[in-house]
């Protein structure tokens, strides 16, 4: 069993993009920014416990940080982990429904 304190640190924020919106509509998949050291099992447990939905599968990938310039200085954004969480049939989770 994963401690509740760890579950709260696993999920960082929803990742809102055009691709994420299409994934939600077509395949009932939500896209989340998660902790870089989070495992698929931890992500699944955190989503099920915090949002009270049933998760079918979790796919993860590491996103490389972009190189950005600020004047003549060159910097780099941090690498981060993205998770595609597919919800079971009939389950629904809406992050941006109240933003209209």
Curated annotation (Swiss-Prot):
Subunit structure: Part of the 50S ribosomal subunit. Contacts protein L29, and trigger factor when it is bound to the ribosome.
Organism: Proteus mirabilis (strain HI4320)
MF-aspect GO terms: rRNA binding; structural constituent of ribosome
Protein name, entry field: Large ribosomal subunit protein uL23
InterPro entries, per the entry: Nucleotide-bd_a/b_plait_sf, Ribosomal_uL23-like, Ribosomal_uL23/eL15/eS24_sf, Ribosomal_uL23_CS
Similarity comment text for this entry: Belongs to the universal ribosomal protein uL23 family.
Keyword Ribonucleoprotein: yes
Gene name of the record: rplW
One GO-annotated biological process of the protein: translation
Keyword annotations: Ribonucleoprotein, Ribosomal protein, RNA-binding, rRNA-binding
Matching HAMAP family: Ribosomal_uL23_B
Domain of life the protein comes from: Bacteria
Any one Gene Ontology cellular component term annotated for this protein: ribosome
């Amino acid at each position: 069993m994963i401690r509740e304190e760890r579950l709260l640190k696993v999920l960082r924020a929803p990742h809102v993009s055009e691709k994420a919106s299409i994934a939600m509509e077509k395949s009932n998949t939500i896209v989340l920014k998660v902790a870089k050291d989070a495992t698929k099992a931890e992500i699944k447990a955190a989503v099920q416990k915090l949002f009270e939905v049933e998760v079918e599968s979790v796919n993860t990938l590491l996103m490389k940080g972009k190189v950005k310039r600020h004047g003549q200085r060159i910097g780099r954004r941090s690498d981060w982990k993205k998770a595609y969480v597919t919800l079971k049939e009939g389950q629904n989770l809406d992050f941006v429904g109240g933003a209209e």
